[in-house]
Amino acid sequence: MSGLPTARPAVFSVPPYVGGESRLDGVNRVIKLSSNEGAFGPPPGAIAALTEVAAIAHRYPDGGATSLRAAIGRRFCLDPARIVCGNGSDDLIALLIQSYGGPGTELVMSRHGFLIYEIAARLAGMNVRKAPERNLTADIDAMLAEVTPATRLVFLANPNNPTGSLVPASDVSRLRAELPPDVLLVLDAAYAEYVERADYDPGVELVDSGQNTVMTRTFSKMFGLGGVRLGWAYAPLAIVDVLNRTRMPFNVSGPAAAAGIAALAEPGWVERCRNHNTRARTELAARIERAGFRVWPSEANFLLADLETADRAAAADTHLRSRGIIVRQVAAYGLPQCLRITIGTDEECSTVADALDDFGQNHG
C-alpha cells in the first residue's frame, strides 16, 4: 500500500475539462469569442438584481428555488413542480448521470456531442458509446443502433455544441419512441432560445407525453448569466424527486436566483438578442466563406469554420490570437480542422471576419 489516499480509477479516465480562454499575454483588450456567451451580457434588470441582493449575501438562499421555478414556469408555461434548478445545466446533467448510470452501464451520444456528457459518464464508471453523425448532425438511426441492454441514458444536444446542427422535432420524437422505456433520454437545449426553425421543439412535448425524457436549459447563453451559474431541468415528477434527493441543499445561490428571475422578466430581451444573432450569424458566415473557408450551418450563437486541416486551423488560431481574438479550437471534439466562433457584437464579428480574411489572403 502507498499510504496515500487513492481516488477511484474512473477519476483518471478523463482529462480535466478546459473551458474557453479569457486572456492573452500582453494583450489588454481581448475579443473573447470562445465560450458562446451572450453578445450583450446580462439584461439590465439582472444586473440591478445582482446589485440589490448583495446586501443579503450572508443569508442562505431558498433551497428549493421556489420563486425562480415559478418564474420559469410563468415564462415557458410549465408546471413549476416539474422544474429543478441547478448550478448551471451541467450540474443537472452530472446529477442525472450519477443517479441513473453507474459502473457497467452505458451512455449513448453522438460523435461530436457536448464533452461534459462523456466526462460525467466516465466519472460515474459508465461506458460511452458514440454514434457516427451525418454531415456533423446527430443520426437518429445510428444512435439507436448503439443502444444495448446495458444502455441507461441517451444524450442529445439540440442544437448541438460545437457543430450548431439541429435535429427536427419529428426525428427526436422517433428517437424517444424507439428507445426502451427504461432508458432515459436527456435533451440538452442550452441554445433553444436562438432557434427560429418551425420544425424544432426543445423537448417540452416529449417530457409532457412520457416518463423517460428530461429537458435541460441554461441561463448562460441567451440570458448572459454564465458567470453566476444557473440552469434548470424540466422532467416527469418521478425524475424531479430523484434530482431533489441527489442535488446539494443550496445548489442555486441567492444572487443567481435573483438574476435569473429578473432576466426572465426583461421586456423584449430574447427577441432583441435573437434578432441580432440571426442577422450577425448570417453576415459573419458569408464573410468567412468569402475568405475561402467552409462554414457549417448553425442554429445557435456560434459558427463552426472548417479550415480543412488541423495545421491550418492551428495557424488560423495563432493568427487570430495575434490580433487579440480568442476563438475555440475543437480538437477535443474530434474536429481538429475546425474553429468554433461565438457570435459577438457587430464590432467583434467584423474584427474576426477581417482577421480571417487577412489569414486567407496571406496563408491560404
Swiss-Prot record:
To which pathway does this protein belong?
A: Amino-acid biosynthesis; L-histidine biosynthesis; L-histidine from 5-phospho-alpha-D-ribose 1-diphosphate: step 7/9
Q: Which residues carry this modification: N6-(pyridoxal phosphate)lysine?
A: K221
User: Which cofactor names does the annotation list?
Assistant: pyridoxal 5'-phosphate
Source domain of life: Bacteria
Q: Catalytic activity, per the record?
A: L-histidinol phosphate + 2-oxoglutarate = 3-(imidazol-4-yl)-2-oxopropyl phosphate + L-glutamate
Which UniProt keywords are given for this protein, alphabetically ordered? Amino-acid biosynthesis, Aminotransferase, Histidine biosynthesis, Pyridoxal phosphate, Transferase
Q: What class of enzyme is it?
A: transferase
Q: Give the Gene3D superfamilies listed for this entry.
A: Aspartate Aminotransferase, domain 1, Type I PLP-dependent aspartate aminotransferase-like (Major domain)
Task: Return the EC number.
Answer: 2.6.1.9
GO MF annotation terms = histidinol-phosphate transaminase activity; pyridoxal phosphate binding
Q: Which GO terms describe its biological process?
A: L-histidine biosynthetic process
**Which family is it part of?**
Belongs to the class-II pyridoxal-phosphate-dependent aminotransferase family. Histidinol-phosphate aminotransferase subfamily.
Q: Subunit structure, per the record?
A: Homodimer.
Indicate what this protein is called per its UniProt record: Histidinol-phosphate aminotransferase
GN (gene name): hisC
